[in-house]
Amino acid sequence: MKKGFMLFTLLAAFSGFVQADDAAIQQTLAKMGIKSSDIQPAPVAGMKTVLTNSGVLYITDDGKHIIQGPMYDVSGTAPVNVTNNMLLKQLNALEKEMIVYKAPQEKHVITVFTDITCGYCHKLHEQMADYNALGITVRYLAFPRQGLDSDAEKEMKAIWCAKDKNKAFDDVMAGKSVAPASCDVDIADHYALGVQLGVSGTPAVVLSNGTLVPGYQPPKDMKEFLDEHQKMTSGK
């Protein structure tokens, strides 16, 4: 009984310390005007990871020091963006909302944050058959560069709510219109995750390990890059 009571007391005390640390962080976030945030453990001692709609922050447990931007693990053969690696859970949670163009013989999977008003996004989509033929599966999420509540966001909402999302996306990228539609898909979730991953323009490509590759790359160049990246990260 005594051992059980002591263990309970220790756990309660530890929980109190954690809450106190989070309270200091929450106080700092409130001072900065950040209302919506998710506090998680950080990969280094004495800090917490804070996910916000404006990006990812690392804050010391006492709430006195802040670092903004990605954190890298350089202990291996190649640097690893541990911030984006951590965000893979959130990325995969949106998998059911992605517009997917699957390669018949899949070798690589990339997630592309796209905008229907982006010229290079159109160019990438026009070459979809070439990406797929090279074994590259493309998964789309929406990232309206003009922000939420823009005309582009409303049109992309209609695409993502269409009965046949792939056809609706193809039509819009070909210059056709799409009928207005509404559903449970929230483009704001796509946009917020893009910001957290470091997306600032489109197209932006996220690899399977969370690595962000900004900008357009032709199919063959993308395939070569993905092959090389796979070798580096696998240590082969």
Predicted regions and their residues:
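Structural alpha/beta surface segment adjacent to cysteine/selenocysteine redox centers
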Residues: 97, 101, 108-116, 120-182, ...
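N-terminal "domain-start" segment that seeds a small globular fold
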Residues: 76-99
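Thiol/selenol-based redox catalytic cores and closely related redox-interacting motifs
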Residues: 37-38, 47-51, 55-58, 62-74, ...
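Short, non-transmembrane alpha-helical segments in secretory-pathway proteins
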Residues: 19-35
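Sec-dependent signal peptide recognition
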Residues: 2-9
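Extracytoplasmic
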Residues: 34, 45-47, 54, 96, ...
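A structural preference for short, hydrophobic beta-strand core positions in alpha/beta folds
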Residues: 38-41, 140
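N-terminal signal peptide c-region/cleavage motif recognized by signal peptidases
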Residues: 13-17
